[in-house]
């Protein structure tokens, strides 16, 4: 066990490594089958190896043979459901081009490769034009970056330039964030000049989205036009003031890491000197942010080191808490604490007494994963924000589930999801230490919902009849069933403890039971 003690017991961070046999060096920790449990993924040119996480934290291994990929994810791997079939697709960002592995309805993958030369770096899935379909963005090292607009029919149209358009590239670490709180996704690109020269090629860029699909480069105005050498950045609201701040990690010993505080007016101030981050003198390419000790403040993982957020815009260095590439991050035993997967090992977070909440976002008008949604919670600790993102850090793919630490708070007063479509869902009095799923638009009528995932369903998977456990809490309930596209496929009064699901197509669904102001939901699989 790697034990790292910091301050009071509730702030400790410790990880226990556990071996896992994997194929390939390109990895992800992400739900692949629509059950919202983070799975362990490794890929090669001809194989997708998935360890499907089970509700008890165990795994079931499956290897899926693919056609030999024209491009392997030698530089980065991204994941999302771009065709809305309830299964997660993969993007392979290679040194010569880009390949999509589209998860089909036969439990395999169909290859889609593009002919254009792309020296890929970080890749992301994001709805660039906000039409409800996930597009893809790929940093180009030696030319303007490229993006693939989703046509809504499972195909993409290739574009180059406009976002990350410096002629000789230098585009390394893209991350899509709403830095100006205007409801649309902007793009920050961490840049580098591989020969070490400091010039325009290595000046970080920030592209502001005007909401109409047009992007304007504003890094200099915002105070983020640094020409340090960097491969990635980590964006979070480190002081819980409602504005996203940014840690820019140096990849060169000639530069230091920077923490820039969002002033709330579209500009940033370098506050590095007062934060303690300069205790981190090692450099590298992987930077991301999660609340590793669930104390309600986002921490920074930088090349295996953790900068533990003290809650006052200062950080305490925990050296080499994780492997030096951070790994793919997610909850790999469904206990509410963030774990890491890398190098044939899962590093399980040993946790503490702090509380937590995980939210699964299911888009309807927006993209099905809810990528680009802003999730806000308010508890006694204060207000926290998160965004749903695909592709953070530099190389690996981490969870699409939204994770909050809550310290010792035992209830969340309000939970709000602002979707890319403009729809806003609000839940009140949400219990802690649970995973909830929210379908876009399910609360817009203002219902004061108490959402839990305590429904007992059996058998699950079900073929003909789905039985419910104890329903004595209900007096006059009705039920609705939603598919993974957020469509309501069944609805009726619940007059027995069994629901006939024989007419449903095979796949993943969410059952919602509503009784007055109470709403309970649970996932199930139809076979």
Q: Which residues does each PLM region occupy?
A:
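Blade-edge motifs of beta-propeller repeat domains
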Residues: 11-25, 52-73, 90, 102-118, ...
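Gly/Ser/Thr/Pro-enriched helix-cap/hinge segments flanking short amphipathic alpha-helices
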Residues: 15-19, 315-324, 328-451
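Beta-propeller blade termini
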Residues: 23-34, 74-82, 120-130, 149, ...
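Acidic carboxylate motifs that coordinate Ca2+ or other divalent cations, activating on Asp/Glu
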Residues: 35, 39, 85, 131, ...
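Hydrophobic beta-strand segments that make up the repeating blades of beta-propeller
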Residues: 39-44, 90-94, 136-140, 187-191, ...
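Short, solvent-exposed loop/turn segments at conserved positions within beta-propeller repeat blades
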Residues: 46, 96, 141-143, 196-202, ...
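A short loop-to-beta-strand structural motif that recurs across blades of beta-propeller domains
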Residues: 47-50, 97-100, 146-148, 203-207, ...
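C-terminal outer-membrane/trafficking sorting elements
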Residues: 380-384, 410, 416-418, 448-527
């Amino acid at each position: 066990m790697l034990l790292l003690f910091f301050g009071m017991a509730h702030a400790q961070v410790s990880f226990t490594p556990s071996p896992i046999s994997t194929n390939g060096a390109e990895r992800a920790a992400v739900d692949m089958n629509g059950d919202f449990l983070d799975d362990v993924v490794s890929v090669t040119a001809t194989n997708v190896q998935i360890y499907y996480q089970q509700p008890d934290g165990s795994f079931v291994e499956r290897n899926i043979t693919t056609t030999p990929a024209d491009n392997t994810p030698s530089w980065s791997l991204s994941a999302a459901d771009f065709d809305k079939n309830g299964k997660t697709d993969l993007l392979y960002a290679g040194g010569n081009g880009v390949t999509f592995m589209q998860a089909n309805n036969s439990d395999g993958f169909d290859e889609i490769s593009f002919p254009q030369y792309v020296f890929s770096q970080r890749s992301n899935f994001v709805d660039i034009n906000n039409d409800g379909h996930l597009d893809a963005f790929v940093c180009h090292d030696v030319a303007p970056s490229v993006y693939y607009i989703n046509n809504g029919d499972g195909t993409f149209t290739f574009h180059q330039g406009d976002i990350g358009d410096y002629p000789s590239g230098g585009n390394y670490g893209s991350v899509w964030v709403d830095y100006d709180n205007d409801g649309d996704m902007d793009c920050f690109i961490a840049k580098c000049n591989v020969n070490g020269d400091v010039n325009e090629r290595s000046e970080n860029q920030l592209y502001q989205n005007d909401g109409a699909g047009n992007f304007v480069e504003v890094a200099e105005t915002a105070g983020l036009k640094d020409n340090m050498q960097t491969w990635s950045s980590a964006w979070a609201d480190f002081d819980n003031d409602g504005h996203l701040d940014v840690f820019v990690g140096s990849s060169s010993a000639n530069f230091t890491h920077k923490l820039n505080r969002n002033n709330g007016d579209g500009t940033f101030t370098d506050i590095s000197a007062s934060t303690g981050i300069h205790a981190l003198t090692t450099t590298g390419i992987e930077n991301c942010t999660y609340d590793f000790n669930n104390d309600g403040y986002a921490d920074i993982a930088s090349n295996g080191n953790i900068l533990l957020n003290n809650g006052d815009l200062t950080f305490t260095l925990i050296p080499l808490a994780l492997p030096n590439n951070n790994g793919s991050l997610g909850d790999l035993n469904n206990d509410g604490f963030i774990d890491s997967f890398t190098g044939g090992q899962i590093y399980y977070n040993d946790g503490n007494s702090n509380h937590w909440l995980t939210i699964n976002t299911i888009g309807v008008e927006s993209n099905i994963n809810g990528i680009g949604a802003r999730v806000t919670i308010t508890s006694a600790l204060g207000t926290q924000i998160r965004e749903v993102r695909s592709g953070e850090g530099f190389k690996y793919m981490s969870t699409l589930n939204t994770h909050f630490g809550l310290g010792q708070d035992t209830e969340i007063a309000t939970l709000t999801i602002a979707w890319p479509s403009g729809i806003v869902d609000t839940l009140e009095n949400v219990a802690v230490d649970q995973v909830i799923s929210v379908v876009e638009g399910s609360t817009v009528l203002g219902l004061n919902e108490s959402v839990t995932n305590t429904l007992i369903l059996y058998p699950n998977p079900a073929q003909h009849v789905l039985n419910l456990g104890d329903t004595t809490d209900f007096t006059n309930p009705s039920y609705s069933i939603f598919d993974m596209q957020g469509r309501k496929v069944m609805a009726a009064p619940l007059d027995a403890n069994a629901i006939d699901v024989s007419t449903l197509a095979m796949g993943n669904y969410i059952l919602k039971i509503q009784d007055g102001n109470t709403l309970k939901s649970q996932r199930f699989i139809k076979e």
